[in-house]
Amino acid sequence: MVRAITFDAFGTIIDTGREVLIHIAREVCAEHRAGLDPEAFLDTWDRYFFGADTEQFLTLAEVTEDSLAKALHEYGIEADPRPYIDRLEALWLKAKAYPEVRTVLAALDGIPRAVVSNADDAFLKGILRRNRLTFDVVITSESAQAYKPRPRIFELALKALRIPPADVVHVGDSLEADIAGASRLGMRTVWVNRSGVRRGPGDPTPDVEVRDLSDLPEVVRRLP
């Protein structure tokens, strides 16, 4: 029986599509390197972002700015990354919940729920507040000083919920950060595959796969 649900934030309940990042990449190219493909620049930025060394904890804002600085340097662009990060954060703060989220959360009323997100504390709470979304527990990578899929961030949520992992289902869009991370602790998992990608050989296997959150109340009801 599912006694609690933990949710990833971005890509799961909050829509922060790639278009925001490509918008910033276009601004960089237009202002400093006409002719540079914004997608190629964003791929380079992504490479530094996802390849960041997280042994020494940095906030998500710090990782984002540092990875942008490295991408700028790789292309020989002498520009301060900070103004672009400010613009990016301003756009992200306008992010909205996916259309089905409020209906789904209402249908799950009575089940304790938490957000477990690779995000900075004030940033995430501001977005949740603007979208009028309330959760019993909000755990961020900043408050945990650890990023998913590391166990600590999930452990803090479980401790706050006071429910054993076997009775908690985690819902997220990342096979590695969400599905693998939660599964290692014995939590059940629901993969939100909004883009319809196919899992590759060796990818983590969720207990359930859904296209969006619409079916989540029924999924939760059916899980043993």
Pin down the residues of each PLM region.
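N-terminal helical cap/lid subdomain that shapes the substrate entry/recognition surface
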Residues: 2-99, 109, 120
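Asp-based, Mg2+/Mn2+-dependent phosphohydrolase catalytic module
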Residues: 1-5, 79, 102, 106, ...
